[in-house]
């Protein structure tokens, strides 16, 4: 029988080989917390000591929560989804991910929720990447002045409160005054730029619906689709029945999608409809998290809520690609009170405001823009020169008209100059009326406003102003096409162009018929001939001589 011998070297080599080849596949470390309190879309979690601010936490059933309050031994989270199945004692796990949104051109033409998930039933979206929602806005040195116009197609805005690429222009007014309509028309007006195929002209749009009814959001989608504008628009929807957390993060998701295009050297337009509901959702979240309330029960950082959002709108420097993000935030007022807390906050953040007044809306002035309280701090630097040359007189005439209109309400006798000013102002107000979904190209706007401010419409009855404008602009396009071409190519209203417009107005007035069937310009009646200038033929008359019998 052979003796079994094991050498120590063999044992050592075997152990070393086993240790070197060992791979730990099941060993790992995971932080697990537990739900302490839950309700009203809020959950308090104990444990998870290494959680980061704005980190996503995973609850039972895969529901996500956003860590907002990092307290000693406890975390206050906002549930981003259905919270009915979340109960006390359930486990909560860290994801290690900061709140972010997928971005890319695949989102154009789609409707998504505030987490970037499609909700339009058109399948999954292939994202080009993701972008964190809480990132620093561009610094001062990374920006350049706003100087390129962004045409909205709305005469009253493009003429008197011009918007430039990279600007933040507030749309403010009571409910049911046409705020959403103005924003949607601005999106629709980018259609021609999109179809041109020129990246320097194209503007990609994002519409963020916060706290809106689902039927209202459906109407917006239909309006954009019918106008051919959905192809370059992304809609981020947080309807009224969604949790407060979705309404809170929806604007940041929309801005993340738009910023992706801006940092790629492209141009984007974002509409926040409306930030009042986001502030109310943030107030509800803060009160449930027991943050100390301030004015109107809003938390102390509600200003920062909107400032860090709107500061992301910018015109980047050429070194960063020269992209731009233009913001149109919407704020809803109560009883036209623009001095309330949230309206004054956003007014101080933005670069101007368009104030829509309910009284004007009820009078049939659509869009119901109050030119006295509406302003653009960018001013004429964001206007083409042709528009700038005619818009200054328009604002002055309308301001004088409003002042005289209030004075004339007392029944005082007015001199002829005042009556003429009132008559022209009434025609200018009628000229600025514009139907929904029919934006005007800038060259047609310039011609229309030129005709109004130079008195060419003073002899046209107010009831016929809009029909005269429509037919006259079409007449110029047919008979004087060089007018529009000159404005588009040069951006100016030259003396030669004005001379052509003078001829066009005079010619068109001769063929325009009023609503009562009478011609606008009566042809002068032919004057009678001067008898002194008429040569008459003289015929000699031969009378027979009188007979002698007749003499007797």
Curated annotation (Swiss-Prot):
Cellular compartment(s): Cell membrane
Primary localization: membrane
Recorded GO CC terms: plasma membrane; proton-transporting ATP synthase complex
UniProt cross-references to CDD domains, sorted A to Z: ATP-synt_F1_alpha_C (cd18113), ATP-synt_F1_alpha_N (cd18116), F1-ATPase_alpha_CD (cd01132)
Entry's family note: Belongs to the ATPase alpha/beta chains family.
Pfam families: ATP-synt_ab, ATP-synt_ab_C, ATP-synt_ab_N
Protein name: ATP synthase subunit alpha
Keywords: ATP synthesis, ATP-binding, Cell membrane, CF(1), Hydrogen ion transport, Ion transport, Membrane, Nucleotide-binding, Translocase, Transport
Documented EC number(s): 7.1.2.2
Keyword Translocase attached: yes
Recorded topology in the membrane: Peripheral membrane protein
Subunit structure: F-type ATPases have 2 components, CF(1) - the catalytic core - and CF(0) - the membrane proton channel. CF(1) has five subunits: alpha(3), beta(3), gamma(1), delta(1), epsilon(1). CF(0) has three main subunits: a(1), b(2) and c(9-12). The alpha and beta chains form an alternating ring which encloses part of the gamma chain. CF(1) is attached to CF(0) by a central stalk formed by the gamma and epsilon chains, while a peripheral stalk is formed by the delta and b chains.
PANTHER family, per the entry: ATP SYNTHASE SUBUNIT ALPHA, MITOCHONDRIAL (PTHR48082:SF2)
Recorded GO MF terms: ADP binding; ATP binding; proton-transporting ATP synthase activity, rotational mechanism
């Amino acid at each position: 029988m052979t003796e079994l011998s094991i050498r120590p070297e063999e044992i050592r080599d075997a152990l070393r080989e086993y240790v070197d080849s060992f791979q730990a596949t099941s060993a790992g470390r995971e932080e697990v917390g537990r739900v302490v309190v839950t309700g009203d879309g809020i959950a308090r979690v104990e444990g998870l000591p290494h959680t980061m601010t704005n980190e996503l936490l995973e609850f039972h059933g895969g529901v996500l929560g956003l860590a907002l309050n990092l307290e000693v031994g406890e975390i206050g989270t906002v549930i981003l989804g259905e919270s009915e199945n979340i109960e006390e004692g359930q486990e909560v796990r860290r994801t290690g991910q900061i709140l972010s949104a997928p971005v890319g051109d695949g989102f154009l033409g789609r409707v998504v929720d505030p987490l970037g998930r499609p909700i339009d039933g058109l399948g999954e979206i292939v994202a080009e990447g993701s972008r964190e929602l809480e990132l620093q806005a561009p610094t001062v040195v990374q920006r350049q002045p706003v100087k390129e116009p962004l045409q909205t197609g709305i005469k009253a805005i493009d003429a008197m409160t011009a918007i430039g690429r990279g600007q933040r222009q507030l749309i403010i007014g009571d409910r049911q005054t046409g705020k959403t309509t103005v924003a949607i028309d601005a999106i629709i007006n980018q259609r021609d730029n999109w179809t041109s195929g020129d990246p320097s002209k194209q503007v990609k749009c994002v519409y963020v619906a916060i706290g809106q009814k689902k039927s209202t959001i459906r109407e917006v989608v239909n309006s954009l689709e019918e106008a051919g504008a959905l192809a370059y628009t992304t809609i981020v929807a947080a309807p009224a029945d969604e949790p407060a957390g979705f309404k809170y993060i929806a604007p940041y998701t929309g801005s993340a999608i738009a910023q992706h295009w801006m940092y790629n050297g492209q141009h984007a337009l974002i509409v926040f409809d409306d930030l009042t509901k986001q502030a109310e959702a943030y107030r509800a979240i803060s009160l449930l998290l027991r943050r100390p309330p301030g004015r109107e029960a809003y938390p102390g950082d509600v200003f920062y809520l909107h400032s860090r959002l709107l500061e992301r709108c910018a015109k980047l420097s050429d070194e960063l690609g020269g992209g731009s993000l233009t913001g149109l935030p919407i704020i809803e007022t109560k009883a036209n009170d623009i001095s309330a807390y949230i309206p004054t906050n956003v007014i101080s953040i933005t670069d101007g405001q368009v104030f829509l007044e309910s009284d004007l809306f009820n009078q049939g002035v659509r869009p119901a823009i109050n030119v006295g309280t509406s302003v653009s701090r960018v001013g004429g630097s964001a206007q083409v020169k042709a528009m700038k040359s005619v818009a200054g007189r328009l604002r002055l005439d309308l301001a004088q008209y409003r002042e005289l209109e209030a004075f004339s309400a007392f029944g005082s006798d007015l001199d002829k100059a005042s009556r003429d000013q009132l008559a022209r102002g009434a025609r200018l107000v009628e000229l600025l009326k514009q139907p929904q979904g029919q934006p005007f190209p800038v060259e047609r706007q310039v011609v229309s406003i030129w005709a109004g401010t130079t008195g060419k419409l003073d002899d046209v009855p107010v009831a016929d102003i809009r029909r005269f404008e429509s037919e006259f602009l079409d007449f110029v396009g047919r008979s004087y096409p060089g007018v529009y071409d000159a404005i588009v190519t040069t951006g100016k209203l030259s003396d030669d162009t004005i001379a052509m417009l003078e001829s066009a107005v005079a010619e068109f007035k001769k063929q325009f018929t009023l609503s009562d069937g009478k011609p606008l310009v009566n042809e002068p009646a032919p004057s009678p001939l001067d008898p002194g200038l008429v040569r008459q033929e003289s015929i000699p008359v031969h009378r027979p001589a009188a007979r002698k019998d007749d003499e007797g």
